[in-house]
Structure formats: C-alpha cells, structure tokens
Amino acid sequence: MKMENLISMFCFSSKGSSKRRTKGSSTWFPQPDQHITIRTFRRLKAHQMLSHTWTKTETSLTMEVSKSMADQLEEVNSLPTTLMPRHSIVDPSYRPSIY
C-alpha cells in the first residue's frame, strides 16, 4: 500500500486483568511531504524497571511517498526509545495521551 493512499492507526488500552478495553482508531490520507508525529507508549514489565515508567517513542518525520507503509513502520520501530516517569504516581487516574 502506498503512503499517499492511506494511513490507519489502531491503539488499545486495558487496565490490569479487567476485561474492559478502550479502543480507538483513526484513518487519514496524507499529502506528499506532509509532516507528522508518531507517539507510542507501552508499559514495561516489572523486571525491566526500577520505578513506574512508560516507554515512550516519539518520532517527528516527513513521510516519503515513495516508501511503502511497511518500510516506513520498520524505520520508525528501529528508532531509539527513551524512558519517562509515569505521571500516575501522583494521580492514579491519569492516562497519557497518544496525541
């Protein structure tokens, strides 16, 4: 699928062993050389962290229309990941936004 055709993003969040899930998706048609930011968050496993942290990957890039979606995603996935403190240490109801 070519980048100028469609970008579709799906995300989900679940809390503990709860069966309730919040799902979201968005679809848009990017323009050539359109600048976009991709942010992803994932919870680290207990043995990977000393305190409550989120793994955050934030990428700002100009999508290249000539590359396939798979190539674009592979490039984003290869970028380094940084650790950030989880804000819910103060407020347990806080959930970081992916937008």
Curated annotation (Swiss-Prot):
Instruction: Tell me the domain of life.
Output: Viruses
- The reply to whether RNA-binding figures as a keyword in the UniProt entry is no
One short Pfam name that applies is Gemini_C4
Q: Which UniProt keywords apply?
A: Host-virus interaction, Inhibition of host innate immune response by virus, Suppressor of RNA silencing, Viral immunoevasion
UniProt-listed GO biological process terms: symbiont-mediated suppression of host innate immune response
Entries under InterPro entries matching the protein: Gemini_C4
Q: What does this protein do?
A: Pathogenicity determinant. May act as a suppressor of RNA-mediated gene silencing, also known as post-transcriptional gene silencing (PTGS), a mechanism of plant viral defense that limits the accumulation of viral RNAs.
Task: Describe the family membership recorded for this protein in Swiss-Prot or TrEMBL.
Answer: Belongs to the geminiviridae protein AC4/C4 family.
This chain belongs to the protein called Protein AC4
